[in-house]
Amino acid sequence: MSRHVAIVTDSTAYLPPQTMERHGITAVPLTVVLGDQALEEGTEISARSLALALQKRRSVTTSRPSPDVFAATYRAVAEAGATGIVSLHLSSELSGTYDAAVLAAKEAPVPVRVVDTGMVAMALGFCALAAAEAGEAGGGLDEAVAAAGKRAAGTSAFFYVDTLDYLRRGGRIGAAQALLGSALAVKPILRLEDGRIEMLEKVRTASKAIARLEEIVAAQAGTGAVDIAVHHLAAPEGAERLAERLRGRIPGLVDLHVSEVGAVIGAHTGPGLLGAVVAPR
């Protein structure tokens, strides 16, 4: 298995650790700022701790990795034997992570191709896996970037949140959309579109919204070979129920991942998040 092309992503890809290890993928952590503490996602703050902080209405913000952190990562990967790096990151509409990676790539000891996938969570994770598999098959930088781009182009992400307040506070959704949702007391279904979070539908109750989310995901999956990821924050039972229902509805299902999002995404969605990523093969 070739490691000449190394894959770097960020902590919002939420890839299982064993999957990252198997494919040699490195994740650069984003930071959650809880009060006056800056904590690395994945190692210094858990999703559960984040959910508790949000429920207590503590001040929570997030920040990108610095260019210096990316530069150190690129050097370490090159020293481990990589002759080129594909660095795949969450949407630049949602974070400055891509910009930090671009700055660091200019000083890297080996060629680095930095890609704004326009994705987040396992929508980003599936892109990183596609790039890694292209490298393992003997492809170079161009092939790995193309594989990630192809996966991103076909991938969709949908999610339900209990309230739009967290997205509004973090500037990830327009104030007008958030105000409309709150004023009408509706439950929003959102989607990732062109790298931005957009309102897809407004439903009257949580149960109807989750049922509608299931319908949307099943329709998007179609009948061909497809991977699905179900994400949640502090809603494990709801995530398992959604996953089980999708298993019975999607004939071409290959892999189904169920996981809790990390603290960075959780900070902007709040507890009760249920989401699904649809990634055709």
Regions found by a protein language model. Name each.
Residues 64-65, 116-118:
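Short beta->alpha junction loops
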Residues 1, 72-83, 216-225:
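Glycine-rich phosphate/diphosphate-binding loops that line cofactor/substrate pockets in enzymes
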Residues 52-57, 74, 133-134, 277:
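A general structural signal for short secondary-structure boundary/capping elements
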Residues 61, 87, 114, 229-230:
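Short catalytic-loop micro-motif centered on adjacent basic/acidic residues
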